[in-house]
């Protein structure tokens, strides 16, 4: 969905960072897939136990950007009847990019700094870093025919509003699980190369978080900030 571009010559492109061998695209025809963006923020607090933080939106849509189909409308109705918001969108790819816009930025920054969303957004240096990464990602998306429906400032404000939420990447790093780096950041780096778009800030953060992931894998370790004992 992210890499199927309307740009000439790139419609058949496949992002190797998320489908290295091509087995997903070969095994599951695109026509069998319905796009959905999961907006609720949550936290894995125990095996099999997920704590819901906020959010109830699950936008859905056909991948080819066609008008709503019967199957999409049925899925939307099921979500709605269960108490969720599931609007049917004509351009689900743009909505996926909107979600990715924040994920590729806040996830690695939080993983490297061990900070929550509100901490990142309210600290001037990391807020500007996030904005720089988002500007670069937006340039990549524009070359792929994607237009964002919200401004950069509004997207950052939305992340700040979530509050003291620990991102999924930071949760993985603290728990010693392999962080989801390539799907969230590496894909955009790959698409930037495909579209000849410079992304210096994204590249730098990607290199750092990849090195962290490599160290965790080699040491079978986790990285967590621990409070120090204060002498009486």
Predicted regions and their residues:
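Active-site-proximal catalytic alpha-helix in oxidoreductases
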Residues: 54, 93-121, 125-138, 164
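Rossmann-fold dinucleotide-binding core
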Residues: 3-95, 99
């Amino acid at each position: 969905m992210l890499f199927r571009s309307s740009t000439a010559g790139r419609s058949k492109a496949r992002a190797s960072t998320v489908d290295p061998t091509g087995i997903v695209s070969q095994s599951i025809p695109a026509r069998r897939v319905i796009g959905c963006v999961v907006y609720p923020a949550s936290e894995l607090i125990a095996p099999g136990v997920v704590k819901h933080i906020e959010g109830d939106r699950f936008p859905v849509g056909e991948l080819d950007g066609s008008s709503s189909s019967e199957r999409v409308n049925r899925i939307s109705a099921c979500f709605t009847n269960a108490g969720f918001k599931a609007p049917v969108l004509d351009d689900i790819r743009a909505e996926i990019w909107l979600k990715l816009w924040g994920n590729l930025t806040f996830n690695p920054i939080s993983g490297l700094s061990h900070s929550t969303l509100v901490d990142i957004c309210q600290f001037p240096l990391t807020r500007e870093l996030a904005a720089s990464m988002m500007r670069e990602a937006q340039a990549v998306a524009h070359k792929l025919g994607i237009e964002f429906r919200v401004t950069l400032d509004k997207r950052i404000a939305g992340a700040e509003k979530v509050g003291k939420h620990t991102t999924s990447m930071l949760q993985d790093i603290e728990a010693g699980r392999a962080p989801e780096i390539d799907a969230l950041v590496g894909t955009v780096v790959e698409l930037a190369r495909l579209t000849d778009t410079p992304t210096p800030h994204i590249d730098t953060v990607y290199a750092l978080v990849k090195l962290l992931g490599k160290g965790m894998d080699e040491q079978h370790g986790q990285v967590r900030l621990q409070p120090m004992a204060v002498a009486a």
